[in-house]
Amino acid sequence: MERATGPGSLARTLLLPLLLGLVAGTVTARRTSDLLAPTAEAAFGLGAAAAPTSATRVPATGAVIAAEVTVEDSEALPAAAGEQEAREPEPEPEEEPDIRPCGRSLVIISTLDGRIAALDPENHGKKQWDLDVGSGSLVSSSLSKPEVFGNKMIIPSLDGDLFQWDRDRESMETVPFTVESLLESSYKFGDDVVLVGGKSLTTYGLSAYSGKVRYICSALGCRQWDNDEMEQEEDILLLQRTQKTVRAVGPRSGNEKWNFSVGHFELRYIPDMETRAGFIESTLKPSGNKEQSKIISDVEEQEAVMMDTVIKVSVADWKVMAFNKKGGHLEWEYQFCTPIASAWLVKDGKVIPISLFDDTSYAPNDGVLEDEEDIVEAARGATENSVYLGMYRGQLYLQSSVRISEKFPTSPKALESVSSENAIIPLPTIKWKPLIHSPSRTPVLVGSDEFDKCLSNDKFSHEEYSNGALSILQYPYDNGYYLPYYKRERNKRSTQITVRFLDNPNYKNIRKKDPVLLLHWWKEIVGTIVFCIVATTFIVRRLFHPHPHRQRKESETQCQTENKYDAVSGEANDSSWNDIKNSGYVSRYLTDFEPIQCMGRGGFGVVFEARNKVDDCNYAIKRIRLPNRELAREKVMREVKALAKLEHPGIVRYFNAWLEAPPEKWQEKMDEIWLKDDSTDWPLSSPSPVDAPSVKIRRMDPFSTKECIEIIAPSPHSSRSFSVGISCSQTSSSESQFSPLEFSGMDHGNVSKSADAVCQLQDSCLTDCEGEDGTMDGNDEGHSFELCPSEASPYIRSRERTSSSIVFEDSGCDNASSKEEPRMNQPPVGNHYANKLSALRHSGSKSSEPTVSVSPSRPTTLSLDLTKSSVGKLQPSSPKVYLYIQMQLCRKENLKDWLNSRCTIEARERSVCLHIFLQIAEAVEFLHSKGLMHRDLKPSNIFFTMDDVVKVGDFGLVTAMDQDEEDQMVLTPMPGYARHTGQVGTKLYMSPEQIHGNSYSHKVDIFSLGLILFELLYPFGTQMERVRILTDVRDLKFPPLFAQKYPREYAMVQDMLSPSPTERPEAASIIENAIFEDLEFPEKTLLRQRSRSMSSPGAKHSRHSSSPHSPLPSN
């Protein structure tokens, strides 16, 4: 028996531990099954008596919800979306799930796949538990498909707002209705769409630190688990899910056209019964009011700080990170497999929302910063991004921290009003300036085993991550875009970011960039520096310090012409001229008209006086070279179109206009022939190639604004010289004019040759006072004339010499105002130009004694040798097209010249001045009645006919040539107070609204009329005085003499110069003013003292001058 019982006892001893282990395993399995959440059948009594021991996912129908809780250990990897593998948790002490450690914190994360996870921030971000409620993802939509809305795409936001993306315009706009407004609106959306759907709220009661589902409440009711075993001291997390679903179906077929569903979670913390003092409600209270539906607002956001650790969420990288607040280094991070929708920090009985859009970055300690600039760039978190555009399973969605759509009212009727044509609904716009979340565009993927496993289990995420899915996200290495919300659209943040380098303990770890040794490149560096200095000096001198001989202001009567042809060279190209003659081109101007004289030249071109060969009457012909650009050409055509529509006694009469496009160099050659033709009364002639003069431009005074141009024409027949002086100075006024031109001759036989030199100079040099560089002719013999003689130059009297003067009152190139007047002491000359030159005087000269202008030599000399053929090498850049305008012939003397010739109050009779002004006002009133405005009224634009009738002219031609950037006409249609902001016209006569660039109307002409009336009644002694007084009058500061002598005119001028356009009178009321009623205008006024032209059929035209401004002896 002892032998038999010995082995048996040994066997029983060995089997006893095995039985005990089997019993312990059974108990452990039961306890594990208690930890698992029940399924939907057990929750709502759908046929299951008890919760199964394994978590299974049941498709959500209606409000059926399944839940799965996974308790993680330190070795477990994060659970992937839709993961079905069984997890066997490691046995833990029995008291750990039940007893909550003091001061324990949790980071609760909600992801787009509908799962809830808890991380332990005190244990390096270890996942504490993971819950799948089984109700599907938070976002689902078919609105992004191109076949739904064409080029427009509707992108839902997780909080229920809708945004519209326009592919063509690349703009993001907020749709003026939300999901709730869609549900509240009528069930019929248009004629072919019916809206169905609803809003569901589901509340989950979870154990804060174990993840157990205690109860689930929805519209179908509530279901509880383990009420008996539930401990009162355990903390509860109240998780509420709001899901909004809208479906559009066809009313006849019932087929679904599009749908979308968005949802989000809200978290509250319910502490145990003993720690009610730590209870703080969530910032969100469930309500249908949109103003109360904010989860996080800018004011309410607070940084998730735990001791010295800051919790941050990277939406684009799906990461939760913890940074050390003092050092700024990364302590731990956790990578999720799906995008993060919301995040909270549960700490000390409080729920602190974690901002998903906080740009404040913390640099990890192991990543050493390169320089101080990197630190500043890393700490630039002063602003937040407002909207994040991401993608989940091929579906675009938006997350926003600032509710942009709350600033705009939403209406259930918004859908109907959008379809109406007259509806005006302001749509907020998010500027499409996406900020890619990655710091660099370099396509480098950082390897992550955990993230790769997530992608391998989710084909949608993998495809989305690899190819960017839709057209908005084309860059394959970015998961989304940040759309910034600028500071001017929101209140200033209370948080201020301060960067302190000295107080940072890690400042010593900053690695300075290695210096680059450039010693062996010193030659290249020095050469580059020298080259830059030389180039900069040259450019500055050329641009800002032009040649002193070219420093000359342009005046409105400056001798300019558009047919700037080359000077006559010593060796003419006969072959090219023969080709032009044989081209067969016939000019209409030469066919119908006979040129008489040059009336003047300016920025607009050339004005001729010509006699029509058919009716034998004289007309003014304007010849303008049209610019090549189409827009500028249209501006030049303004005057033609304006004059053709205007027929009034006070406006220059228009007869005809035509275009001519001569062959290359044809116009220049024909000008030479016209100048050489003595049969016409043309004051300009061309010198022969042998007598081609040389031009010398000199500055007479280094402190003077005048220039000297001396032309020396060599002559083999005479040793005496002939000089001419032209003052090219300009006053400070914009209305300045050239000083007269003086001729002083040495030999009467050479007067015609000198006149030829003058004419050639004006056609080639005086256009812009420019010319090709040439050598100075050193021959002392020959004919010369000097422009702009020095005021200090001595005048030498000589009995052997005779003198004559030529007056250029409007333009330096017009000497045709002369008249043939025989002189007693002048010998006969074969050439008829001698008679013309002997009859011309300076307008301000009081003596007829002969004078000679002597110019001392100056070092700054620019000589233009016109005998060189190199000048003729210039070729026109494009074919020239000329516009000819035939219009009424007026006097050369305009109102500006008339005012300058009468510098005293006695010389300006009140009745004459008011008569002139009344005629101007009548012309302006006619313009305004036609819906037009002049915009450039000034004395130089007021002309006189041969019968002393005032004419208003220059309807925008000068403006069109000088202001290419102005797109509006000077004669502009005037529908009431139209908006015109172009700064055109002379600034001295411009209204304040024109100068300031504000909108203006036809009242700008009234302002100019007021200044003209004042200038008519109040003479000025000098141009400086004129500018100063007119500037004061613009500010309603009148001279006392004017107010005393003309009280009624003073009151009218005050009204016309009112700063407010509405207070200025109309032109019609000005004409009807009482000051014009008691005046008797004589049939022939003092205007007859001005120069007038007389012509008779068959006789050459001559101009007589009897003005006191330019007295000439009547010998």
From Swiss-Prot:
Topological domains, Cytoplasmic: 536-1115
Record field: compositional bias (Polar residues): 845-860
Protein topology in the membrane: Single-pass type I membrane protein
Cellular localization per UniProt: Endoplasmic reticulum membrane
Single GO BP term: endoplasmic reticulum unfolded protein response
PROSITE patterns (alphabetical): PROTEIN_KINASE_DOM, PROTEIN_KINASE_ST
One GO MF term attached to the UniProt entry: protein phosphatase binding
Catalytic activity: L-seryl-[protein] + ATP = O-phospho-L-seryl-[protein] + ADP + H(+); L-threonyl-[protein] + ATP = O-phospho-L-threonyl-[protein] + ADP + H(+); L-tyrosyl-[protein] + ATP = O-phospho-L-tyrosyl-[protein] + ADP + H(+)
Phosphotyrosine: residues carrying this PTM: 619
Residues at which ATP binds: 599-607, 622
Family: Belongs to the protein kinase superfamily. Ser/Thr protein kinase family. GCN2 subfamily.
Function: Metabolic-stress sensing protein kinase that phosphorylates the alpha subunit of eukaryotic translation initiation factor 2 (EIF2S1/eIF-2-alpha) in response to various stress, such as unfolded protein response (UPR). Key effector of the integrated stress response (ISR) to unfolded proteins: EIF2AK3/PERK specifically recognizes and binds misfolded proteins, leading to its activation and EIF2S1/eIF-2-alpha phosphorylation.
Protein name listed in UniProt: Eukaryotic translation initiation factor 2-alpha kinase 3
